[in-house]
């Protein structure tokens, strides 16, 4: 797998608080006209905290089906625990993600002193 090139962190489109998979397909069609190496779906700006597991699966599967196999789909799978992250990463692979992007836990457990 080649991770060279530009990978766009994409926003997740919604309409009336529901996923807008048609808009996602339209956006991907436009982005695939460029030289992007791939996309990051549900990354740090992809609203991953606002979607449930089934919606995440739908987003990843829709992205994979709307893109050529030569372009990579990287899925944001970082969660608040190791167990949940492993589960999300496996689900992402099953939905068609080529790789995962795991960010660390968002909970602020460190004190100000520990951060200095």
Labelled PLM ranges:
Residues 1-116:
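Active-site beta->alpha loop and helix N-cap motifs at the rims of alpha/beta catalytic domains
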């Amino acid at each position: 797998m080649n991770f060279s090139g530009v990978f766009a962190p994409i926003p997740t489109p919604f309409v009336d608080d529901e996923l807008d998979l048609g808009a996602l397909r339209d956006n991907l069609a436009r982005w695939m006209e460029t030289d992007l190496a791939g996309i990051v779906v549900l990354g740090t700006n992809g609203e991953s905290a606002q979607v449930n597991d089934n919606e995440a699966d739908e987003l990843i599967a829709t992205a994979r089906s709307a893109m050529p196999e030569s372009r990579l789909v990287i899925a944001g799978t970082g969660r608040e625990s190791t167990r949940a992250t492993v589960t999300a990463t496996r689900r992402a692979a099953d939905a068609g993600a080529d790789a995962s992007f795991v960010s660390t836990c968002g909970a602020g457990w460190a004190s100000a002193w520990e951060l200095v």
